[in-house]
Each structure stands twice: as structure tokens, then as C-alpha cells.
């Protein structure tokens, strides 16, 4: 990494030097049972314990020599002038689906009154309950303001933010600022926009942009994996469509970030397999975790760029052999989540047994709860850093989902 390229990620397994996290905040306390599906949650984490688990995750990374950055801090540091701060507030409000002009005005006044930038950022993440706003004078109310709704929020919270992997993805020296699957999560990408536009270190054009949040097709970071300095993997999943992948790849190849080939994985379109990294992660030079349930229906395409056009070939051979050939190793071992037991595989995949964060070759952060998968990984010679995640896992994401590498050593 140089001062001109503050992002440097050319593998999934190179020693992790710098990573971005988001500590769960008050947005979690704005979850309620009636609206879990709307906010893409299945359950409500206990915030106090979720924060303790997340702090322990961050400390485990620091203990391994990783510098931990926080999304909320970088976003706050990006509001470098009053004009940029006001522009951020107005853009945030324009994307918040606020019902009623008077309500929008009241929220704007609330946000403008917050003097501390980090407090402002955290408030935008938490959302705004209607009960927080002052009573609007009858003369100022429009029809939308007058028609009462039982929905308690003037602005929805963003409870998925602690999964920092998805709103944007670091690829080589560049970043994919994603357009996400749901309206609920797409609002999260505003923080990445301001970081990579205005932050003193990461803004000002220092980081090439290979995808833009204003695109209309969807892509998420859990479907973007950097296998080596030459090869990327992308998932065609519930959250990422093929059209987005084509746009992303054209931009990556045109900007000459160094990649020569992309492996596109097409698999079942459902919530339990929402991203490629929930069923497939790289843990060593020649080892991957995989969820056995995707193996039968998996289709893989090799994508290269020739004469300013994408060249796409469907691969029909063995997946392990395909990976070995593309990574330049003699053989690749696919380690099944839950082993050969379908019950264990289903349970531990649901609890993100396949969603590992590799912080050095063969050194992997995992949830301690996935005991069968963890025992198999250890039997293969991997060093596991086990973290508690009983509350964090309720959001359906593991250590890789909760982290966005900013710098890795080359391998």
C-alpha cells in the first residue's frame, strides 16, 4: 500500500492489516417484532450483549495485529466542512422515504441541531421514531401529515449495518460502492459514498470506483470475493444479479486493477444462501469451506475480457479442480460445513459456519457455536480464533459478513 492507494486487497487470505467494522448501536434497539421482515431480521439481538460480543471480535483482531477502523468514525471524519455536512443530511433525508413535508422539515431541524459529527452519523443509523419529533402545528401539516399511520418510525433504522461487508467491497486498490437488494439496506451505502468522496485519507479520488450506488441493478459485498491477485469470485444469488456482475467486471477490467479472470457462481436463490460468502469462503492457499447443499445445483462460469468485451464460458468440470487450476496449486480441498451430516450442515450453515474470516493463511475467525464444522477445520490443520456470537448471529451473518478488509499483505 502507498499513500496514493489506501486500499490494498488482493486475496481472501493474505495477512489482514486493516479492517472496517461497525459496532452495533441504537439501530438494534429500534427493531420490533411486527417489522422484522421489513428490516431483514429474523430475531431481535440483545444490544448490550451484541456489543460485548462485537467488542471481543474487534479485540481478537487487534490481538492478531490488525488495525480496526469503524464505519461510524470514518463517516464522521468525512463531514469535513459545514457544506458537506449539510449536503449529507439533505441526501440522507432524500433517501429516507419520509411521509410529509412538515415531518421532513422537523427531522432536518433535529439533525442540523446535532453538533458532534459522530453523534449525527449514529443518529442517522439509528433512525427516527415519530415520538421523538415535536408536535407539528396544524397549519403546517399537509395531508400526509394529517393522515395518521400506526407505523412508529419517521425514518427506518439500519440494523444490518454491522455487516460492513455488503454496502461496499474493496477489490484490489478499488472499491465497489454497491446498489443493494432491498430499499432497507440500500440507504446504508451513503456512508461509503461520503468516505470515498470526502475522507482525508480515503476520499478525493484516491480509490478507483468500480461500481456506483446509483446503478439500478443490485450487487452486495457478500457476493464479491478476491481469490488472488489474478482471480475474483462473484456470486449470482438472492442479493446479486447477473446484470450487476457484468457492469462490475467491465469496470474492473477497464480500470486495469490487475485481475485476469472472474469465476461467477450461480446457486439457489433464497435467504439461507443469501450471499456466496454464506456458503463458500477461502481459508488457506488450498482450502475452502463450502455448504454441501449448494454443490448439486451450483453452476460456475469463467469470465475474461478480450477485445473490450466479456468472454463467458460455463465450466463443467469438478469445482475443486477448477479452483486448483485457477489458483496455481496442486489440489484444492473443499471442507463441508457440518461434515456429511445434513442436519448439522443445515444448522451450522444457518449459524454461519461457512462464513469465516481468514486473517492469515490457515488462520480463521469463526463463531464458537459451530462445533462440528470447527472440529473439522481444526483437523485439517487450521488455527481457529473462536468468538462468541449468540446475539450477533441473529442478524444472519458471521465474521466475514461483519468485516471489510482495507489492507492485506500480498501472498
UniProtKB/Swiss-Prot annotation:
Give GO BP annotations, semicolon-separated.
Answer: arginine catabolic process to ornithine; arginine deiminase pathway
Q: Which subcellular locations apply to this protein?
A: Cytoplasm
- Which keywords describe this protein according to UniProt? Arginine metabolism, Cytoplasm, Hydrolase
Which GO terms of the cellular component aspect does the record hold? cytoplasm
Q: Which Pfam families match?
A: ADI (PF02274)
Its UniProt entry gives the catalysed reaction(s) as:
L-arginine + H2O = L-citrulline + NH4(+)
Write out the transmembrane intervals. none
Classification via InterPro entries: Arg_deiminase
Molecular function terms in GO for this entry?
arginine deiminase activity
Report which superkingdom the organism of origin falls in: Bacteria
Enzyme class, top EC level, equals hydrolase
Designated gene of the protein? arcA
EC number(s)? Answer: 3.5.3.6
Q: Which family does it belong to?
A: Belongs to the arginine deiminase family.
Originating species: Streptococcus equi subsp. equi (strain 4047)
Q: What is this protein called?
A: Arginine deiminase
- What is the active site of this protein? 401
Kindly list any coiled-coil regions of this protein.
none
Q: So, what pathway does this thing act in?
A: Amino-acid degradation; L-arginine degradation via ADI pathway; carbamoyl phosphate from L-arginine: step 1/2
Amino acid at each position: 500500500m502507498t499513500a496514493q492507494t489506501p486500499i490494498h486487497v488482493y486475496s481472501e487470505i493474505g495477512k489482514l492489516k486493516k479492517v472496517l467494522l461497525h459496532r452495533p448501536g441504537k439501530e438494534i434497539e429500534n427493531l420490533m417484532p411486527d417489522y422484522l421482515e421489513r428490516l431483514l431480521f429474523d430475531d431481535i439481538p440483545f444490544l448490550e450483549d451484541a456489543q460485548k460480543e462485537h467488542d471481543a471480535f474487534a479485540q481478537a483482531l487487534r490481538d492478531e495485529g490488525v488495525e480496526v477502523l469503524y464505519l461510524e468514525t470514518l463517516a464522521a471524519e468525512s463531514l469535513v466542512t459545514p457544506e458537506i455536512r449539510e449536503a449529507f443530511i439533505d441526501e440522507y433525508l432524500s433517501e429516507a422515504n419520509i411521509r410529509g413535508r412538515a415531518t421532513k422539515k422537523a427531522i432536518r431541524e433535529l439533525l442540523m441541531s446535532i453538533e458532534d459529527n459522530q453523534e449525527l452519523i449514529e443518529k442517522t443509523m439509528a433512525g427516527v421514531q415519530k415520538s421523538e419529533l415535536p408536535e407539528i402545528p396544524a397549519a403546517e401539516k399537509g395531508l400526509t401529515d394529517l393522515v395518521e399511520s400506526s407505523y412508529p418510525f419517521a425514518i427506518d433504522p439500519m440494523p444490518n449495518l454491522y455487516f460492513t461487508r455488503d454496502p461496499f467491497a474493496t477489490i484490489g486498490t478499488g472499491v465497489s460502492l454497491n446498489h443493494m437488494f432491498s430499499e432497507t439496506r440500500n440507504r446504508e451505502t451513503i456512508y461509503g459514498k461520503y468516505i470515498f468522496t470526502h475522507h482525508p485519507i480515503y476520499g478525493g479520488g484516491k480509490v478507483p470506483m468500480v461500481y456506483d450506488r446509483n446503478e439500478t441493478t443490485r450487487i452486495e459485498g457478500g457476493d464479491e470475493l478476491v481469490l488472488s491477485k489474478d482471480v475474483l469470485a462473484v456470486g449470482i444469488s438472492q442479493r446479486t444479479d447477473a446484470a450487476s456482475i457484468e457492469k462490475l467486471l467491465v469496470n474492473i477490467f477497464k480500470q486495469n486493477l490487475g485481475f485476469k479472470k472472474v469465476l461467477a457462481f450461480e446457486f439457489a436463490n433464497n435467504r439461507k444462501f443469501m450471499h456466496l460468502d454464506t456458503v463458500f469462503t477461502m481459508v488457506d492457499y488450498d482450502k475452502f469451506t463450502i455448504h454441501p447443499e449448494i454443490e448439486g445445483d451450483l453452476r460456475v462460469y469463467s469470465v475474461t475480457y478480450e477485445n473490450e468485451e466479456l468472454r463467458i464460458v460455463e465450466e463443467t468440470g469438478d469445482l475443486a479442480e477448477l479452483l486448483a487450476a485457477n489458483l496455481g496449486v496442486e489440489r484444492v480441498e473443499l471442507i463441508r460445513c457440518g461434515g456429511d451430516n445434513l442436519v448439522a450442515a443445515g444448522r451450522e450453515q444457518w449459524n454461519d459456519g461457512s462464513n469465516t474470516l481468514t486473517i492469515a493463511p490457515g488462520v480463521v475467525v469463526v463463531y464458537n457455536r459451530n462445533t462440528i464444522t470447527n472440529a473439522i477445520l481444526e483437523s485439517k490443520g487450521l488455527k481457529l480464533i473462536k468468538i462468541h456470537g449468540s446475539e450477533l448471529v441473529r442478524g444472519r451473518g458471521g465474521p466475514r459478513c461483519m468485516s471489510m478488509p482495507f489492507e492485506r499483505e500480498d501472498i
